[in-house]
């Protein structure tokens, strides 16, 4: 009976949007199980592959993501919560779209709720937000610092030293960096303590103590600020070279 139902669904030739709705309704886990269950082969695997591919594509559609970012400022808490859930599903594509909105001064009225949504998305936002610290946009940097502090992100610690002590930092960034470090390491370092910490951290990097695990092919992805795109972008480095990049 189930196999006949699968055959009927395949015969309908549902478009990507309809497939996405189907996956949202029954859950992606059902399709992963369907793909692995030999009782329903080959139709089950065919349907599962098509449905999951469509869901992946739809979740990351730029127009859909842009609409979800707009919905973060909807007066309805339930609509905002659903938008955050859908943005989480879209992954890094959504994070970058949200950062682009934070960098847009014309959308300043939306910034607080967008920043809160980034915080609620959790770990996935950390590396792109660290990349934002290379921006020349003080408003964006302040939001990034505040979110990293709220997430209590240890790997952000060395990147917060510069805005804390640089004479070029506006007061707002100095205060934000101090508050973030207080949240992360439960203390605000003196300048001499910070210098000792950075020297020690550089030595650790050269000894191979990298901020993240290398992938199977021996590479590591760093998010760095792209001055032309005015966004953080992922850059893949050989793990052996990352110490030089991070230390710089």
Model features per residue range: what roles?
Residues 25, 29, 193-196, 201-247:
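Short coil/linker segments at helix-helix boundaries
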Residues 51-63, 67-71, 185-197, 235-237:
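TPR-adjacent "capping" and linker segments in tetratricopeptide-repeat scaffold/adaptor proteins
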Residues 2-5, 9, 18, 95, ...:
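Solenoid-repeat scaffolds in large eukaryotic assemblies
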Residues 4, 43, 63, 78, ...:
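Residues within HEAT/ARM-like alpha-solenoid scaffolds
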Residues 5-6, 160, 164, 206, ...:
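Inward-facing hydrophobic residues that define packing positions of alpha-helical scaffold repeats
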Residues 34-54, 63, 197-207, 218:
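Intrinsically disordered, low-complexity, charge-biased linker/tail regions
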Residues 7-11, 21-25, 38-41, 47-59, ...:
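Structural detector for internal amphipathic alpha-helices that build alpha-solenoid repeat scaffolds
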């Amino acid at each position: 009976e189930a196999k006949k139902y699968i055959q009927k669904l395949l015969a309908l030739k549902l478009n990507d949007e309809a497939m996405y709705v189907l996956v949202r309704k029954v859950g992606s886990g059902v399709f992963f199980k369907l793909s692995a269950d030999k009782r329903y082969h080959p139709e089950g695997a065919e349907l599962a592959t098509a449905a999951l591919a469509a869901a992946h594509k739809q979740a990351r559609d730029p127009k859909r993501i842009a609409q979800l970012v707009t919905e973060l400022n909807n007066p309805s808490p339930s609509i905002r919560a659903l938008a955050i859930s859908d943005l989480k599903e879209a992954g890094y594509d959504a994070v970058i779209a949200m950062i682009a909105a934070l960098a847009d001064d014309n959308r300043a009225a939306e910034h607080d709720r967008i920043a809160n949504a980034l915080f609620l998305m959790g770990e996935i936002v950390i590396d792109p937000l660290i990349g934002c610290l290379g921006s020349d946009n003080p408003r964006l940097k302040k939001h990034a610092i505040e979110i990293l502090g709220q997430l209590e992100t240890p790997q952000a610690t060395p990147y917060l030293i510069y805005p804390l002590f640089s004479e070029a930092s506006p007061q707002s960034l100095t205060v934000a960096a101090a508050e973030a470090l207080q949240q992360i390491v439960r203390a605000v370092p003196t300048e001499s303590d910070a210098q000792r910490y950075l020297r020690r951290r550089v030595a650790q990097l050269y000894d191979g103590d990298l901020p993240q695990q290398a992938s199977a092919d021996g590479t590591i992805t760093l998010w760095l600020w792209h001055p032309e795109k005015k966004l953080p972008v992922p850059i893949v480095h050989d793990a052996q070279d990352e110490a030089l990049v991070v230390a710089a």
